[in-house]
Amino acid sequence: MIGIYKIENTINHKVYIGQSVDIEMRWKEHLYALTRNLHENHHLQNSWNKYGAKAFTFSIIEECELSCLTDREQYYIDLYGGINSDNNYNNRDAGYKGNLSESTK
């Protein structure tokens, strides 16, 4: 399934918004990294470590065409306060595929 997904901390209600052409596989990748303390998003990883897996939910928030993935991901990142906000674990704009700098992590 192609679309936009949300990982939400049910305790503090912070969210991580992402996009994928295979949402189920992407969720498995997040789980793999988070459970091994390897997630590239240090803010999300720290919350996972603090609150535990049971404090997080994963949901698909929109199915969309491949051509609109980045625009829709950015829409939801902005809807939840934008990058590096108090409501959002996202630390880069939608569609970014490069490596994070140490300061961004």
What do the PLM-derived regions correspond to, one by one?
Residues 1-105:
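Structure-specific nucleic-acid interaction/processing domains
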